[in-house]
Regions:
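Canonical positions in the second alpha-helix
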Residues: 122, 166-167, 201
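TPR alpha-solenoid repeat register
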Residues: 132, 177, 211-212, 220
């Protein structure tokens, strides 16, 4: 099984996110600025994404966030690798944590497009970040549960399942990912996989006294 989501080769839901690039315009930073900032090797002749609303306030941070937004929408974007290199040089891979926090906030407002975009950017910047995949799985799941169109639901459902699978590979201790992955397998009629996944969930949550864990454990025991 692959241990990362190759969105640049296989992007199930990008078609639903691409319209959001309409708020971005692209411009090149001046050669003198790039030299001064020590970024010429990464950004020479590379168009940089700016938001129409931020043209008076262009900072290292706004540029990095806009780059993350673009690759979150379109992981096959021509300058994706330049953008990731810029983010890692201007900040570091912990930049992904801020994107995850933003994504969680968007998801809490039921804006699952924006949430998915942040999480997709996060695991491109930090491919080992289990939380980014887990949160992406949750956002895709919440999106398809509100969806009505069959193709939309199918694409988000498949994306959600793969994200939860990869979350458990990146962090085999991430109990919540096993919980949702089990339901993903049940949805697909993969009952043996669901059973094994839920047994792992019960093993990981044994003796955990966190809020609501006991109810979830009972619910899963009832299903096994």
């Amino acid at each position: 099984r692959d241990n990362k989501m190759n969105l640049e080769q296989k992007d199930r839901i990008g078609q639903y996110l691409r319209p959001h690039l309409g708020q971005i315009i692209f411009d090149e930073l001046s050669e003198s600025y790039l030299e001064r900032a020590g970024l010429a090797d990464i950004l020479r002749d590379v168009p940089v994404p700016l938001r129409k609303t931020e043209l008076n306030n262009i900072t290292t941070l706004t540029i990095a966030r806009n780059m993350a937004f673009v690759i979150g929408v379109d992981p096959a974007f021509q300058y994706r690798d330049n953008y990731i290199a810029y983010i890692l040089r201007a900040f570091d891979k912990r930049f992904a944590e801020g994107l995850i926090a933003d994504g969680v906030e968007w998801a809490s407002k039921n804006d699952f497009d924006y949430a998915c975009i942040q999480f997709r950017a996060a695991f491109q910047i930090d491919p080992e970040n289990a939380d980014a995949y887990y949160c992406y799985g949750r956002a895709c799941k919440d999106a398809y549960e509100l969806g009505e169109e069959e193709e939309f639901i199918g694409r988000f459902k498949a994306e959600s399942l793969e994200a939860f699978e990869i979350a458990t590979i990146k962090n085999p201790q991430l109990a919540e990912a096993y919980y949702f992955l089990g339901y993903g397998y049940v949805n697909m009629g993969l009952y043996v996989k669901a059973k094994l996944t839920w047994e792992e969930y019960l093993k990981l949550t044994e003796g955990r006294a966190a809020d609501g864990i006991e109810e979830l454990r009972q619910e899963i025991r009832g299903r096994l």
